[in-house]
Amino acid sequence: MESSSSKGGFKVLIIGGSVTGLTLAHSLDKMGVDYRLLEKRKEIAPQEGASIGILPNGARILDQLGLYNAIEQSAIALGTSDVYFPDGFHFTSSYPKRMHDRRSFAYPIAFMERRKLLEILYDLLPDKSRVEVDKAVSRIEEHPEHHGVLRAYTHDGDVYEGNLVVGADGVHSRTRREMWRLSGSSPTGDVPVSERNSTSVEYACIFGISDGIAELTPGRQVMRFGNGWTLAVIPSRQGQVFWFIVQKLDREYQYGSAPRFAPEDAAEQCSKLARLPIHGDVRFDDLWQRRKAVNMAALEENVFQTWSCGRLVCIGDSIHKMTVNLGQGANCAIEDVAVLCNILHHALNEKANSELSDQDVEALLRRFHKEHFPRVSRVYDMSWSVTRVHARDGSMRKFVGRYVAPYFGERLQGRLFNLMADAAKIDFLPLPRASRSGWEEYRSSERNALLWASSLALLIVLIALFTGRSYW
């Protein structure tokens, strides 16, 4: 416990020890704020067969926290992406290289094993005693005697206390359910049933890691778009290949009713792509036969409207969940940490040694939502669209993917660069790397809005010419 040296004795309980929770732990440590992290799993970094993309918006924050150098040594930076279509047409995109260009963002689009990232985030914590595993939270309550304190009860009977509880426990968040329950007795009213049931599932993903194949070049991504599915292959370092298949399901499901998948389901789906060419003579079956880890899961999609109640707030996948195609799930969660900590840092400094009242905490959490909700919604909307263009879901999206992106990609990529440049950072920590012009050049502005409008107009004209229909 470090309450004597923390800011005003303020303590944060973090529920969940994945990327979001561990990043928050590092940020709170930099702030000098006491915390305790509770992870329900028996280990911090289990093997789940998944890779993770670290994009410039997440990388910049991790660099501010002193973590990126270790990550960079284990990750593979993408240089190009070879994109293939069902009719045999293919093109090579330099979008990843442009993102990393010295005139852009200084950080690449990089991939690494998710388990390795978790190991780095945990190993570099200054005080690992603040992290406890096998601590599944069963309920959260207000302290019956001490005002301004919440209690988290774990399955083994332990009780933990904090002035702020942050749910970083993923899409199946127990913290979110407790927030909904507590909101029923809040003056602001209950969370409506329509919001509680707003998460949908239309896609599933098979994540895999295979032993390397000599014909596949590290850092040269291969993407194949099919009707209703997308395959991405990322050859990495240390003789590994990361890959994933995003598959459209038979219908749209509501959260809770989506199918659960067994290893046999993944094997059945992958067998259908066995003869699919990857590069040269390499077929997908070559990756499957060399698999080291495989997992299949539903891909939930939603941005919840309600993020907090009283002294309890949710971040990361517990409040916004998107598909993997854009690679922004974890990176957006890292931004959550930056925005929340910026606001908390300001509030604690304003109060000096005084306690943050209920009104203070509720105000800062409302500010967190107000400032960050538009950003999260924008990232979510783009992720939603990219996934469906990749899966060729509908005639218009087929047209955009096949006939617009290959030829007008650089103009349309400006929107992705805008998305990156508008990202949050930690305001109270320095930027370790020299600022690159991309962060300012591509930040949303009237000029960039006009450029995007002209690109959209071009797209509409092309679609009209192709379909013979007017969209004006």
Swiss-Prot record:
Position of the signal peptide: 1-27
Glycosylation sites: 197
Subcellular location field: Membrane
Bilayer topology: Single-pass membrane protein
Superkingdom of the source species: Eukaryota
Practical use: Diterpenoid pyrones display various biological activities and FDDP C shows anti-cancer and anti-HIV activities. FDDP C also shows inhibitory activity of 42-mer-amyloid beta aggregation that is involved in the pathogenesis of Alzheimer's disease.
Gene Ontology cellular-component annotations: membrane
GO biological process terms held by the UniProt record: terpenoid biosynthetic process
A Gene Ontology molecular function term of the record: monooxygenase activity
Matching InterPro entries: FAD-bd (IPR002938), FAD/NAD-bd_sf (IPR036188), FAD_mOase_fung (IPR050562)
Pathways per UniProt: Secondary metabolite biosynthesis; terpenoid biosynthesis
Cofactor(s) annotated in UniProt: FAD
Keywords from the named record: FAD, Flavoprotein, Glycoprotein, Membrane, Monooxygenase, Oxidoreductase, Signal, Transmembrane, Transmembrane helix
Main subcellular location: membrane
Residues that bind FAD: 39, 53, 114, 317, 330
Record-listed E.C. numbers: 1.-.-.-
Gene3D superfamilies: FAD/NAD(P)-binding domain
Residue ranges crossing the lipid bilayer per the database entry: 448-468
Family (UniProt): Belongs to the paxM FAD-dependent monooxygenase family.
Function description: FAD-dependent monooxygenase; part of the gene cluster that mediates the biosynthesis of diterpenoid pyrones. The first step of the pathway is the synthesis of the alpha-pyrone moiety by the polyketide synthase dpmpA via condensation of one acetyl-CoA starter unit with 3 malonyl-CoA units and 2 methylations. The alpha-pyrone is then combined with geranylgeranyl pyrophosphate (GGPP) formed by the GGPP synthase dpmpD through the action of the prenyltransferase dpmpC to yield a linear alpha-pyrone diterpenoid.
PANTHER family recorded: FAD-BINDING DOMAIN-CONTAINING PROTEIN-RELATED, FAD-DEPENDENT MONOOXYGENASE ASQG-RELATED
Name of this chain's protein: FAD-dependent monooxygenase dpmpE
